[in-house]
């Protein structure tokens, strides 16, 4: 995944208004713990989670995982 954790954090922080990790994860349909681990690079998200994240940010999977 390379720079995925940093990209994910920057996507969340670039949204206006800026939302907390808890609110963002709930809107995505993920648990706050899962999003936290993805942003820290502790766990790589599975395809299901990647699709939820990409849909939330209105970007393609390619853009998300580049």
Describe the function of each predicted region.
Residues 29, 48-63:
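DNA major-groove recognition helix of helix-turn-helix/homeodomain DNA-binding modules
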Residues 32-36, 43, 62:
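Key DNA-contact positions within bacterial/archaeal DNA-binding proteins
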Residues 7, 19-20, 46-49, 60:
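Residues that mark the N-terminal boundary/hinge immediately upstream of a DNA-recognition element
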Residues 13, 40-43:
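Alpha-solenoid HEAT/Armadillo repeat architecture
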Residues 1-17, 23:
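A short, Lys/Arg-rich alpha-helix, primarily the initiator
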Residues 1-2, 14-15, 37, 55, ...:
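Short, charged recognition helix plus adjacent turn
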Residues 16-37:
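Short alpha-helical DNA-recognition segment
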């Amino acid at each position: 995944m390379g720079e995925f954790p940093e990209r994910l954090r920057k996507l969340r922080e670039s949204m206006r208004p800026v939302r907390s990790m808890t609110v963002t994860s709930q809107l995505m349909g993920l648990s706050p713990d899962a999003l936290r681990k993805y942003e820290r690079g502790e766990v790589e998200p599975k395809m299901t989670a990647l699709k939820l994240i990409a849909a939330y940010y209105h970007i393609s999977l390619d853009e998300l995982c580049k």
